[in-house]
Amino acid sequence: MRIYYDFKKDIGFNFLIYKEDYLDKIGKRFNLINEIEINDSEFDKVFIIKSNDESLVKKVLCKSIKEFLIMNRMYLANFKLDKEKNTTVLNLNAPFDENNLTHMEDVLSFMKKTIDIIVGFNTKTNANNKQA
């Protein structure tokens, strides 16, 4: 299942979070993978994080977001914020059970919280740029 949100503009920030696999472990061993670590040993051990803004991705990965991703790591294909054409889209790709309404509510709540965090950062960034 793919759940996505279109921000209707390019917000200039992107990230990709996905479950670390065997090939990633080899790549990390030989310094072939450039990843961001967030100083959370459980999360860093399970996921690969890539972004164009390390400090912002660390802010997005608040406790509740990390907990959701850890809890659903068996299902997660990837979670990304990326530019598509002239807009930025937040995607959550995972084989969720759409018949489990409680789980779907949790997924939608997770997406809303992530969107609110990103919109909040983007609003602050735009306000700071106007003052400069």
Please identify what each model-predicted range represents.
Residues 2-132:
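Charged, low-complexity intrinsically disordered regions
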